[in-house]
Amino acid sequence: MNTTNKESTEELNNTESNNNHNNFAENGNIINLKQLKRKLPEELQAQAEELKIENINSLLKQELVFAILKKSVEQGGLIVGEGVLEVLPDGFGFLRSPEVNYLAGPDDIYISPSQIRRFGLRTGDTVEGQIRAPKAGERYFALLKVNRVNFEDPSKAYHRVHFDNLTPLYPDEKLGLELENNSKDSKDFSTRVIELVAPMGKGQRALIVAPPRTGKTVLLQNIAHAITTNNPEVFLIVLLIDERPEEVTDMQRSVRGEVVSSTFDEPASRHVQLAEMVIEKAKRLVEHKKDVVILVDAITRLARAYNTVVPSSGKVLTGGVDANALQRPKRFFGAARNIENGGSLTIIGTALIETGSRMDEVIFEEFKGTGNSEIVLDRKIADKRIYPAIDITRSGTRKEDLLVDKIILNKMWVLRRIIDPMGSSEAIEFLLKKLENTKTNGEFFEMMKSPERPKNGL
């Protein structure tokens, strides 16, 4: 991408770069670019009318934001911008916005190569700072001062350890998903069932194996709600690939977290670009010892997109999958890990099966052994309108003894031994009936006798 922005002395950060943006609010009103982008188009149009901007009906949302910012600066306003850095091959970069799914637009913020070198910035860094309007002959807003990098002091970014050099460990801290059933009318037991059959930890790499119409999207929404409720310290990102637009809107309105999407009418290259931005952002946050969770719907569609854009190797597997196509989606999924001395990246992704596509079956087989937790949804259970349609006997987590107390673990094993002779439908019906009579899993276990530890595990 070409740009007419030139490096200038005002684009170089000085010793005041670490000051909070409140320190430079003296000459005018502060306009927060992030808050502006979150406004509805109707609100932006009303604001543009107040500023007497012409032809607002013909402008797209990003163009409208650009026009409002430019007019506000002319009237003496100061702008604070935030975005996720994408460094281009030429050395300079732009701050992309999650509000527009990291799509390039006129309201992106230019960062010069000297600023990138000074603070050791890389693709995926979340940068906040003061920006200025484009000068004559320039097309983009430019960053003047860096206030924060990944929500911390900029000096910390220069001394962080690269993600690939961090030591991965098994998840050893539980990611609480259980939500209390405070009323008898509450019919959602999905997160409580997951806690019983496949407990999640920070750093988990989990697959939700789902045939069509088994409730995987609703299950993801319930998991997202549980994460934001029980783990407020976790940074949640929901990544929707090749999805229907109405499902994107539903997810955005029901999830308190960052929801980014690439719908089915967009090219495969766009799916790939969005996924790369999300995983790079997550890695940068983990380097700052933060806990990040990515919910992906679906890993299968992401692998299809990579299969479309990857250069042909001449070796084609069954179903039309290129031999080299799955390396990059595996690298995406494999980034999930618990980090020694702080930080974790958890990825919970859906894998589609029984779609009638041979390619989907090949993709699932390739990903089958890569996760350390698996939740299997059953079409037969869903056809009976029993939700969550989880096949308990086929779902589970590796090294669950690191996440669960020994006494509770023993009771979970006894529960599996009771359920094992049953069919998949009878097992989930039996468990749901028991859960309906209790508010929490703790109460459920109180009903069970304290058993001895089984000699042969499950």
Swiss-Prot record:
It is an enzyme of class 3 (hydrolase). Signal peptide: none annotated. Its EC number is 3.6.4.-. Residues 78-153 form the Rho RNA-BD domain. One of its GO terms (biological process) is DNA-templated transcription termination. SMART domains: AAA (SM00382), CSP (SM00357), Rho_N (SM00959). One of its GO terms (cellular component) is cytosol. It comes from the Bacteria. Keywords: ATP-binding, Helicase, Hydrolase, Nucleotide-binding, RNA-binding, Transcription, Transcription regulation, Transcription termination. Residues 1-26 are annotated as: Disordered. The keyword Hydrolase applies. Coiled coil: none annotated. One of its GO terms (molecular function) is ATP-dependent activity, acting on RNA. ATP binds at G201, K202, G203, Q204, R205, A206, R213, T214, G215, K216, T217, V218, R244. Facilitates transcription termination by a mechanism that involves Rho binding to the nascent RNA, activation of Rho's RNA-dependent ATPase activity, and release of the mRNA from the DNA template. Homohexamer. The homohexamer assembles into an open ring structure. HAMAP family: Rho (MF_01884). Belongs to the Rho family. This is Transcription termination factor Rho. The gene is rho.
